[in-house]
Amino acid sequence: MSTITAVWAREILDSRGNPTVEVEVVLESGATGRAAVPSGASTGTREALELRDGDKDRYKGKGVQVAVANVREEIAEALVGQDALRQVNIDNILIELDGTENKERLGANAMLGVSMAVARAGANLLGIPLYQYLGGVNGKLLPVPLMNIINGGEHAPNNLDIQEFMIMPIGAETFAEALRMGAEIFHTLKGLLAADGHNTAVGDEGGFAPNLESHAQAFEYIMKAIEAAGYRPGADVALAIDAAASEFYKDGKYVLAGEGKEFDAQGMIDFYTDFVERFPLISIEDGLAEGDWEGWKKMTDDLGEKIQLVGDDLFVTNPEILAEGIEQGACNSILIKLNQIGTLTETLDTMELAKTAGYTNVVSHRSGETSDHFIADLAVGLNAGQIKTGSLCRSDRLAKYNQLLRIEEDLEDDGIYYGPALKEAFFGED
């Protein structure tokens, strides 16, 4: 009943209008699984390779027909007849079939689409929710969303170098309440920006993309929006950023072109420390460049006891690189992106290693997304506690939030929203 009988792929478009891979898997029972693969804009150099066609006359070189063909032919031939319920075996077959360290032969986009679709087919075969299939009977933690409401960097055509300014509704009692808080703050922020004559167009992930005087002004607008929406900064809503510092690291310096400033690693740490002292900022992702290991160790020494320091480009969801970071004392958290590593099994291995080492897991989308909401189930099933999936507009972002609403409803009283625990960890009790 769980034997794979067919594997198929097609080229679809993501939220930026670029091609990506969608895979369907059919089992002997008739159960099916479908999955679509996301794509990033600011990427780590050690990520698994996303295979693109390179034909400039078609989708400006971004087509994925080769990856699709790899699924339809070589991968399908290897997996037909295999047991879909043996996820580790399926993923090991994919890894061995590819035979490269960074999945450049078959493409991480081809492999991940298959890996995710097989998991969905398995869940559908057993008639259980995907989150339960991934995490077992103990998957019950509804994650705190890191909601990206101001975009900059590679995600927006404005003068902000920091890529994402986010809010975290830690004062909510349920995920549904957290989502409502985020939406109310988002719409309040829009009104404040518009009233001051700022552009309220949105970036790739749905956050506003205004030209502002400084990064501090972005924080100030968000603080005003929180208060104007009727909430308390810190007590109800915390702040987070994704600096994506590798994108503005030039010739050994961190160049904040929008503010006309340049820093070494210590200068950048001091820059962030000022924000931590002035605002309820509890999480900084990619605050330094991916190759600046010495800087990361210093930043962890300086700020690691106070806030969450998240490695994204630094770790690229790779368990071997994470192990190196743990040994060196860099960061205290990891961003989890399925397409950085290319299979579900390797993703779960990375999350387990992080948790064992006392690092937090933040499950994440990519800037080029689809309506697939796999990561919502992953976050709950693995009790990650945090999810980063964009702003409060664009259906590709809301697909994940809406799935979390469904999961919370399905869990009923067994579901636990992680906000109060996170609030107590950073701010204590009211």
Curated annotation (Swiss-Prot):
Location of the active site: 205, 337
Annotated metabolic or biological route of this protein: Carbohydrate degradation; glycolysis; pyruvate from D-glyceraldehyde 3-phosphate: step 4/5
Compartments where found: Cytoplasm; Secreted; Cell surface
Annotated GO CC locations: cell surface; extracellular region; phosphopyruvate hydratase complex
Catalysis performed (reactions): (2R)-2-phosphoglycerate = phosphoenolpyruvate + H2O
Binding site for (2R)-2-phosphoglycerate: 163, 337, 366-367, 388
UniProt-recorded Gene Ontology molecular function terms: magnesium ion binding; phosphopyruvate hydratase activity
EC number annotated for this UniProt entry: 4.2.1.11
Cofactor note: Binds a second Mg(2+) ion via substrate during catalysis.
Gene3D superfamilies: Enolase-like C-terminal domain, Enolase-like, N-terminal domain
Cofactor(s) listed: Mg(2+)
Protein keywords: Cytoplasm, Glycolysis, Lyase, Magnesium, Metal-binding, Secreted
UniProt GO BP: glycolytic process
Residue sites binding Mg(2+) per the record: 242, 285, 312
NCBIfam families, per the entry: eno
Annotated function: Catalyzes the reversible conversion of 2-phosphoglycerate (2-PG) into phosphoenolpyruvate (PEP). It is essential for the degradation of carbohydrates via glycolysis.
HAMAP family: Enolase (MF_00318)
Family under the similarity heading: Belongs to the enolase family.
Protein name (record): Enolase
Top-level taxonomy: Bacteria, Pseudomonadati, Thermodesulfobacteriota, Desulfovibrionia, Desulfovibrionales
